[in-house]
Amino acid sequence: MPSTVLWATDIFGKVFTLSTDGQQWAPCKNGHVEFKRVSAVRSCCWGVGCNHQIYLYVHASDLPIRYQEETYENQRWNPVDGYCEKLLPSDRWQWSDVTGLRHQQLESFMLPSPHWEWESDWYVDENIGGEPTEKGGWTYAIDFPATYTKDKKWNSCVRRRRWIRYRKYKSRNTWAKIPSHEDNKKLPDPFNDITVGGWEITDEPVGRLSVWAASLQGKVWYREDVCQNIPEGSSWTELETPSEVIQISCGPNDLLWASLWEGQAMVREGINRNNPKGSSWTIVEAPTPENGIMHVSVGVNVVWAVTKDRKVWFRRGVNSHNPCGTGWIEMVGEMAMVDVGLNDQVFGVGYEDRAVYFRQGVTPSELSGKAWKSIVVPRGNERSNSESPNSLLSAGCFFGDEIKEHSDSPIPSDIESSSEPEQSAVQENSSDSSEPADVGPSQQDEPKDEELSAVLELDGQQKAGSSLSKDSGEDSAHSAGPVPKAGAPKWTSIDLLEARINPARASGDMTGLSTLGIFTAGEEESFVCETHPLWTWVSGGGCLVESHTPLKWFTLQTGLSASMQSLSLSITPAHTAAWRKQIFDQLSERSKRELDSFRHYEQAVEQSVWVKTGALQWYRDWKPNKWIDVRVALEQLTGTDGSRDSILFVYYTHGEEKKYIHIFLNEVTILVPVANEAKHSFAIYTPEKTKQRWPIRLAAATEQEMHDWLVLLSMSCYESRKLQGAPSSQAIWSVTCKGDIFVSEPKADLESVTNGRSCDQMFWRQIGGHLRMVESSSNGVVWGLGYDHTAWVYTGGYGGGFFPGIASSTDNIFPQTDTKCVYIYENQRWNPITGYSSTGLPTDRYMWSDASGLQECTKTNTKPPSPQWTWVSDWYIDFNVPGGTDREGWQFAADFPASYHGYKTIKDFVRRRRWARKCRIVTSGPWLEVPPICLWDISISPSSGAHNSESIALWAISNKGDVLCRLGVTKQSPSGSSWLHVGTDQPFISVSVGGCLQVWAIARDGSAFYRGSVSPAQPAGDCWYHIPSPHKQKLQQVSVGHTSVFVVDENGNLWFRHGITPTYPQGTTWEHMSNNIRKVSVGPLDQIWVIADKVQGSHSLSCGTVCHRLGVQPMQLKGHSWDYGIGGGWEHITVRGNRADMAKTLQPKENATEKPDPQEENGESAFSHIANC
């Protein structure tokens, strides 16, 4: 899991972040801005400065924030001038938007704020519907509202073309000021609080956020159009409120609460996907009438509040259907404020000590948690350059109390005669050295004038003063007006209470801010490191803390000398690994030395037998197929030479006759877990069972028992085949539709034309982890992608998951998580009485079903894919369905088996909508996460980077469709260093880089592109070349080998690109190769492997079968027939690492064993018994 950060501000307006895997507060670059409050999400942080202005901090990323501006140039044909800008009075504008209703000239487009810059000039889009247009980009139609085509016809009276220009957001890793409302008729309304959330309401547009703000006048404002491509939004909209608001908070979903001046809380209702601003307000009374609510914070299903007496309250019964909740529960502790982060985790700032606290024990079943625990990590060694004498006074306006001059100060005040650099330097020291104190509420008494000033005292030595003034930066270069004398009020607004400095808490003579003047620079720095920082605000909206996440926030390393700390820092993981290897080699040498002395003795036992028995269930072969109880026995024989052979016996009863079947484990090709809610089962394949598509299936009573048998049988198979250690760089990797990862070591003659061995004899072994796809290369660099689009890099280990101890490598095994969605469908039929309802015809599908409609799936009976998965969300309507939906998520059709669309017509008698629920798996494997960009597709050059330091080409597609090139990937550093963004005009879905750095990609509209001039010196190339797709086909995947290019379209057709040469790498034409293909992988020697559907077995058709193309030669890149391997239930395969040289002997054509393509059947596709894809 990648690290996330917790945000906080101290009493001097400085902003800090704390990483979930860190042990130190890191200062954030504030510039000259001091902050009152911050509200963070993962991608950014919004803040309110002490000047009551809104600021935005966007994290830097390798992926730029780009926004596409577009306009259309329209022309009409006339007999005199031909096509020209002279249009009819009833026509649209010459320059307009896509509808033609808005006038949009090129010169009218301006940058929305100083935080943007133009990426390029205007240019013409020469693409329409995935096909390239003629030069100039014109598309033609009979009239403007008609359908446009790229071909000019005799009746094409109008034409248009699209102009594109991109602008890029440049203010990243810095605070960008957001303007207030732009109504010149009204006075500016200073902001007092801000909150960010709402990212779970809808994902259209991508990265949409709800930003709410409260002003000093008690008004509520909503920021429009905040999303990934427009991080700062567009404008402010005021919402009417029944009373004045002092503070506001919104959660990830549709919860929004605000606290009022009268002490009540106010809840926004009606927030949904179509109305993110909500519709009405509801008042919620305070827990106690005498102490009103002064602060609220909301999450997904929780609301926390702090009342004026600093008591903390938890609101029970809160959810999307009841945002007001049912009642208040008082919690232990006194807080200045609380904040609810991700997963409803809670953070707070203590009232007395101003420390940041974390609520321990918060789980989905116990949302209120158990106890508060203080975060005690120190702050980083930052030197403030922007603090002024007004810093303390600005911070004081949050809390209403003051910082007083200590009565027994040993040195008289000299502030009136001090220069500004000296004041700034002393203020800098005081910012990190204030000690917390006991709090005395001052709500009843008016602060005295002398209590409203912070008296700072200086040492009279010129040397110390000049030394400190050097650190004050730019402040020393500007002169300021006279410092206000003691007794003058410094602020007027009161927000929260601040802690007084208690003399009893100071140590020695360090009793107050005035004592700081006696320190030299070095002494002051050591003093600062030992003091406790005073915090005013904390935000956990971007901090993800799981229940199993180990945090290092609650302990400090003490008692180590400087030399010991230096020694511990010098011990790296590489040193540890080297020591382990050295110890292992020494133990192995000693063991060998001791055993060699006795090898000449005769063995007492020539052969040993080891037997394990147990009770399982077996899915019998004959009809009716059902599970029956059996006894199993695993016999392992060890010969005198140490070789081991194993046999598995399955004893069953047929009628009244006792029978058995046996399996030689040296013939087993794969062991596949098939865990589901009904049975803890696994499948055993042999070459014969692979041909039949009917494995031997055994089931255990518990999941642990199933894992024990899988480990035992796997180890026996490894010993029979003398396999151990990690996979080689030549290995073939594959992934099942359940996310299980398997790897096979190819034989040297696998790609030979004279090889008589079928690929159904290949042995596959499981590697720990859970992935959606894997991409390998012959250099040993392997990457994988999870279902949640997280990228993982292979560490070189083996095992993990349920493989313990000796079955797994001790090094390079790390925790891994993955998240995916489970979908069910709600179906309805129209009738003239009730309209659409859940009452269907007797022949209709289930009203709650899976996608096929054949299996009933309700919200109650639908379980996670296996016991290893757990739900992490509730059911919600999924609007991202192919074909689109209406505002409520429905899709319409004439009947259930027909195609669906997102709008209702008079002929639509049925409708459906998809519900989704997220689940998560926690496992382990030889994988390390590559943050922070989520990826959709990935490709590694199969043959580059032969040397350890030579760069390896790696390209990827982000889950938003951006094309990326990974820099710094080598054998020694397989994860690389950074991403390089490659500009495109539209989102992409697939990319592949060949052995000679040929880069091909597929756009979301199904068009193909070739990237020109890619080289080690220019890893991103220079431009895209649009390649026409096969006629009326939308492509969805591409794979490039050494000299060949293959693509798969959305209908499962495999296409081969003809005419590719070094001088013309784009090729000339497409040729159809096969159908029923799901995925294709082309190796470094142009080997062709695919995942095919509808492969005939002995019992049914099999979907998701590994197939290998036979007869591939340098002069015959298409091969001649298919060889079928393991399956079904497979989702992905990669042979990009297999560089085993194929034999050059040509096989006579008449001797070639021709196998038919995967059959195209009119009936249903039956899945294998391994997994239901």
UniProtKB/Swiss-Prot annotation:
InterPro entries named among the record's database cross-references: Beta-propeller_rpt_TECPR, Peroxin/Ferlin, PH-like_dom_sf, PH_domain, TECPR1-like_DysF, Tectonin_beta-propeller
Key words of the record: Autophagy, Cytoplasmic vesicle, Lipid-binding, Lysosome, Membrane, Repeat
Sequence intervals crossing the membrane: none
Coiled-coil boundaries: none
UniProt feature, compositional bias: Polar residues: 424-434
A GO term, aspect molecular function: phosphatidylinositol-3-phosphate binding
Protein name in UniProt: Tectonin beta-propeller repeat-containing protein 1
Native source organism of the sequence: Xenopus tropicalis
